């Protein structure tokens, strides 16, 4: 699935005027492309509001990161659970009206979550780096910054906000981008979870090497429907390379029950990332305990 990083007719600003030359393919072709185009614009604005040197100065005052990958490996629950803090999504709209990130994080930790994932996209998921920073202040387990990372600047934003790991989505990044962003993240002490959606993407990431934590998203990027057997199909096609590189597999999306969790574990997932199914529960702690079993 090809994702264009920018519109074919980017807007040009001259003095107080902003315009774009008409183009027949000027609209995003899918929701992911729409998000990527908007993210590119957001990052440009963020750079002006808070220049990179100021972010770096903030990072230098922080304590060391927690080892996200090792924490998953050492989890007392099997598979390990990455519980997600997510208020809304493009496909589901508002997921949790009573959205109190701090309370949610505490409930997840009490429920037995191995790590947490925090959505930092504001436009489409109603998250933010402020949400991540607030959670970091009260939680001591590792945190994943979940966003649509396109630029190095965003990695510094994540680290400055208290992240221990970042998400890189293979579908929106070139090989060169993946390697470069990986290098920057590692230099900041961050773990990297690379997300793939099919066997072609997984093969591509495995050929690059150096990515010991990979997530298989069970959600179809075109229809946004979920199918848990995606984890099985994708992992099976690349089983030899996965074993050779000692990759820890994470199954993402579409996990609602204990049976779902056990199913993806049987497919080879050592960890699961669960968001919507938990976010819709009134009692998050008990819901997570029941899911873990």
UniProtKB/Swiss-Prot annotation:
CDD domains: IGPS. It holds the Pfam family IGPS. One of its GO terms (molecular function) is phosphoribosylanthranilate isomerase activity. It catalyses: 1-(2-carboxyphenylamino)-1-deoxy-D-ribulose 5-phosphate + H(+) = (1S,2R)-1-C-(indol-3-yl)glycerol 3-phosphate + CO2 + H2O. GO terms for biological process: L-tryptophan biosynthetic process. Pathway: Amino-acid biosynthesis; L-tryptophan biosynthesis; L-tryptophan from chorismate: step 4/5. InterPro entries: Aldolase_TIM, Indole-3-glycerol_P_synth, Indole-3-glycerol_P_synth_dom, Indole-3-GlycerolPSynthase_CS, RibuloseP-bd_barrel. Its EC number is 4.1.1.48. Belongs to the TrpC family. This is Indole-3-glycerol phosphate synthase. The gene is trpC.
